[in-house]
């Protein structure tokens, strides 16, 4: 096991990130294309724990990336049966840039097949980006979709009641990857709903030593985003707020390490 310690300095705050990787090559799994060779990127937003802000991050990140990459295809796929992300983003999206494919505990062959086809098509498109929002709960029926994605984005609060199931969720992903001999999807944990004054993320960094994951820049002030939830007008509507700056910072982190392929290169060298 090779452990890489990465330090990201952001707005004079230093966040300790742990990136753990096995010294292995990229392999193919059943019905899976080698993601490192693909131009498109897919980001799976998930956590077994509910109420950690998955849909909020998914919609704001989608809207930020659409603004950042006006000429690229940025699609939102909402698989959460509640359909929150779909309802928020539908007024701001073209018909071909958003889909609602609810996948619950019961197997839905039509939705699964459709989702599989859309993901593979997007991954084959040059410079496309796909955000997949999911409901709370175990990977269940969507684990194959998670394994197709470049990255799993896992939001969590700093409370132990959220951290413990979050670590269990990542361990399940690690087990799946070990079973198939792959390192994708990379796991990025987002400290979410943190106190604006919080500077010490040692508790989360220590918890991540148990798993193969890195820590992204934190997000605070989600109360601002929630206040816009019922009347969602996109990233521009929260312009000038701390939340806006933090979403932008997270978006640039995703661009630098996921969309650019830098995480793929780091894992290749490990």
Where are the model-predicted features located?
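Extreme N-terminal, non-catalytic leader segments
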Residues: 1-46
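P-loop/Walker-type NTP enzyme "switch/lid" segment
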Residues: 34-36, 42-52, 59-132, 136, ...
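Motif I (Walker A/P-loop) of helicase-class P-loop NTPases
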Residues: 55-59, 166-167
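Structural beta-sheet core signal
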Residues: 75-76, 132, 154, 189-191
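Inter-motif core of Ras-like GTPase G domains
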Residues: 141-160
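Conserved C-terminal guanine-recognition region of P-loop GTPase G domains, centered on the G4
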Residues: 166-181
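Beta-strand-loop-alpha "switch" segments that mediate conformational coupling across diverse proteins
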Residues: 193-236
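NTP-binding/hydrolysis catalytic cores, primarily Walker-type P-loop NTPases
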Residues: 232-270
